[in-house]
């Protein structure tokens, strides 16, 4: 009697495993593509530009040209993975109060021959209910 149940049990287990396979590939906390026009993505991008300028040793501000790609990950809050193009402006960093994002975006660009464009990858963590936002990773080239 045991032998007659084995052939049925094995295919049944295989069928169950195959049915559960799509669920196993949808891992909580995985990366999801986001629209570059999404308001949350825009907010994370603005923060990344401000932080880049605050941390950069460059004497001039860089402004956002465009968001190339955006992804997010659900963590405690949300983590945004952004690929962005930044351009060096004519606005010099001076001592005193640093410029905010909107002021930086209004800075003029140098003539085409003198323009310096960067492609940057930023990771921004946002937790709105704690009113926290942090730049967790940055690399530009």
From Swiss-Prot:
Molecular-function GO terms, alphabetical: cysteine-type endopeptidase inhibitor activity
Disulfide bond among keywords: yes
Leader peptide range in chain numbering: 1-26
InterPro entries: Cystatin_dom, Cystatin_sf
Domain of life: Eukaryota
Disulphide bond pairs: 91-107, 120-140
Segments forming domain Cystatin: 29-129
Key words, A-Z: Disulfide bond, Protease inhibitor, Secreted, Signal, Thiol protease inhibitor
Effect of residue 29 to S: 1000-fold reduction in inhibitory activity tested on papain
Site residues by UniProt (Reactive site): 29
The keyword Nucleotidyltransferase appears for this protein: no
Tissue specificity remark: Expressed at a low level by the venom gland (at protein level).
Compartments, as annotated in UniProt: Secreted
GO cellular component: extracellular exosome
A Pfam family reported for this protein in Swiss-Prot or TrEMBL: Cystatin
Residue numbers covered by motif Secondary area of contact: 73-77
Family classification: Belongs to the cystatin family.
Note: Negative results: the recombinant protein does not inhibit calpain-1 (CAPN1), a C2 family cysteine protease and legumain (LGMN), a C13 family cysteine protease. Does not provoke cell death (PC3 prostate cancer cells) following continuous exposure to 6 uM for 24 hours.
Function: Recombinant AsCystatin inhibits various C1 cysteine proteases including cathepsin L (Ki is 0.89 pM), papain (Ki is 1.74 pM) and cathepsin B (Ki is 0.69 nM). This activity has also been observed in the crude venom. This protein has no toxic activity and its function in the venom is unknown. It may play a role as a housekeeping or regulatory protein.
Protein name from the UniProt record: AsCystatin
Species the sequence originates in: Austrelaps superbus (Lowland copperhead snake)
């Amino acid at each position: 009697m045991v032998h007659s149940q084995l052939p049925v049990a094995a295919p049944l287990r295989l069928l169950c495993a195959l049915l559960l396979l799509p669920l196993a590939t949808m891992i909580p906390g995985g990366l999801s593509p986001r629209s570059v026009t999404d308001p949350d993505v825009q907010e994370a991008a603005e923060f990344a530009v401000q932080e880049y300028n605050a941390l950069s040793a460059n004497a001039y501000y860089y402004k956002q040209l465009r968001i190339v790609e955006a992804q997010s990950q659900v963590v405690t809050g949300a983590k945004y993975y952004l690929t962005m193009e930044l351009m060096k402006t004519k606005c010099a960093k001076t001592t005193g109060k640093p410029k905010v994002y909107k002021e930086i975006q209004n800075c003029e660009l140098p003539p085409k021959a003198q323009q310096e464009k960067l492609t940057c990858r930023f990771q921004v963590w946002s937790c709105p209910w704690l009113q926290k936002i942090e730049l967790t990773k940055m690399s530009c080239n």
